[in-house]
Each structure stands twice: as structure tokens, then as C-alpha cells.
């Protein structure tokens, strides 16, 4: 357990997780539009797969029993590498040029890039909530989800308008 003065750091980390995860989803949608278009039959499954992977991340994070900060740091580093390499325009273009039909390329992109990102980042809130044991469970998770969702909102808004 961290001292009470570390709470702002924990909330900053879950804010970054939220910003990064929804930001990655927005960037992924922008990257696949040239290959698949922007209709609801593209965006809805992308959002759905992302949410499913996020749910699996929450489930995985809930089972973590120790090494909380080391695991979150590792997940952030892997997610950063996946974001940098996997969401780069050249990578997406290569996936869609090399794999046919486009639906299969889309599924490979989702399975290899966006879903692993969501799964890794989704573990953050349940893992870091363990470090807030001095609070009521509802209070700790409520504040963590508040900061994560605020980050998600700002990540989706800033990266979609930018």
C-alpha cells in the first residue's frame, strides 16, 4: 500500500490509461478508414472488439495479487510499443496490402494491435485500485474510474478533433 500522498500519482496513471486507450481507439479508426470506410459496420465492431478486450483486461487485472506498479509499468511500455509500431500508418497499410480479403486484414489488425492494447491498458484500474486499500472499495474504484473515464473522454475528444 502506498502512502496517502501517492493518490494523485495513482489517479494520474489511471487518467493516462483512459486517455491512451480511447486515444488508440480513435487513431485505429482513423487508420482503417482508407481501407474499409467509415460506416457503422466498421466503427461498431471496432468499438465492440475494443470494449470486449477492455473487459478481459479488467478481468485479468482483478486477479493480480502483487507487483502492482511493476506490472502496470510493463503493460504501459508494451502498450506504447504496440501503439507506436501497430498504429503507424505504414504498418496498417502493410497489413491491408498483404492480407486479403480486407475483412481478414481488419481482424488481424484488431487481434494483433488494438485488442492487445485495450487488454493491457484495461488492467490498470483494477491493479492500481489495490494500492488504495486504505479507502472503502467503492470510493477507491469510483475515483479510479472517474479519472480513467475523464482521461478517455479527453483522449477521444482531443484526438478526434486534432
Where are these regions (language model features)?
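Alpha-helical transmembrane segments of multi-pass membrane proteins
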Residues: 1-162
Amino acid at each position: 500500500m502506498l502512502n496517502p500522498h501517492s493518490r494523485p500519482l495513482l489517479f494520474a496513471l489511471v487518467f493516462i490509461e483512459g486517455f491512451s486507450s480511447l486515444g488508440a481507439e480513435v487513431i485505429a479508426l482513423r487508420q482503417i478508414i482508407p481501407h474499409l470506410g467509415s460506416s457503422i459496420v466498421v466503427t461498431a465492431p471496432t468499438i465492440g472488439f475494443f470494449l470486449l478486450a477492455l473487459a478481459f483486461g479488467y478481468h485479468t487485472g482483478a486477479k493480480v495479487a502483487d507487483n502492482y506498479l511493476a506490472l502496470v509499468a510493463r503493460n504501459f511500455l508494451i502498450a506504447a510499443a504496440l501503439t507506436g509500431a501497430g498504429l503507424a500508418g505504414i504498418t496498417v497499410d502493410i497489413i491491408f496490402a498483404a492480407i486479403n480479403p480486407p475483412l481478414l486484414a481488419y481482424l488481424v489488425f484488431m487481434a494483433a494491435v488494438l485488442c492487445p492494447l485495450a487488454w493491457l491498458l484495461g488492467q490498470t484500474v483494477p491493479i492500481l485500485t489495490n494500492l488504495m486499500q486504505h479507502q472503502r472499495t467503492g470510493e477507491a474504484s469510483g475515483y479510479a474510474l472517474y479519472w480513467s473515464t475523464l482521461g478517455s473522454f479527453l483522449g477521444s475528444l482531443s484526438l478526434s478533433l486534432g
